[in-house]
């Protein structure tokens, strides 16, 4: 009887050891599986973010190339007007209307008007216009002040409604102004002037619309170097106060991809600076794993 009791006791201890070993192995296995799962999750998310970042960079590079090509053409129009027309004219005895009309007609799909002013804001010539609006002081407008204040540079404004000239059809034109200081000649004497090329905003809008796929979680927008929005697919909602963008902070960021927490959600933000303008094209991708973020 004593031997049976000892045998049962030893067997019980053996079973307890086996159970302990099994539990230990189970815990270790679960821990290893958990660690493996976490590692794979991070690898997956990192890879996913790397792919999104790479795609965003490629999209912005292409968009920037298209935009820079368009803006380069606008600068070429300004250069042609200045070096081939203005510099060849003595305004005391000659006008520039014919040459300005030819230049406008060749580029009218992208232009609203071309105008030249003296340093005190008097209109020298403009095409194609029905007449100058009354009580408009161009010397108070930003594009004019920028051109006079920094004479060596081109200056691109943000979008605005042109208020310089009357329109026979009473239309309002949204434009982006390209201005520069020029040298005018009158009776052989040189004086400062300002050349203004008003670009049709819709041309730039169409370029940016092509970069937006229609997916709510991904979009591309354009702002100037100070963070003022030039184009945004949700622009109307922003103006109505129904949508917010982190554009003022992002304006200070370097080119490349950045992670940010916005509206308590993670976003992948990629920035690309447009040559000659200081403008920034921004790609925004909402990064989350909850249902509805990716389809």
Residue ranges and their predicted role:
Residues 66-98, 114-131:
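Extracellular/periplasmic ligand-binding regions of membrane signal-transduction receptors
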Residues 105, 110, 123-199:
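Extracytoplasmic/periplasmic ligand-binding sensor regions of membrane-associated signaling proteins
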Residues 118-129, 227-233, 270-272:
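Amphipathic coiled-coil signal-relay and dimerization helices
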Residues 161-164, 181-186, 197-208, 236-237, ...:
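Helix-start (N-cap) segments at beta->loop->alpha junctions
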Residues 226, 234-295:
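Extracellular/periplasmic juxtamembrane segments that couple receptor/chemosensory ectodomains to their
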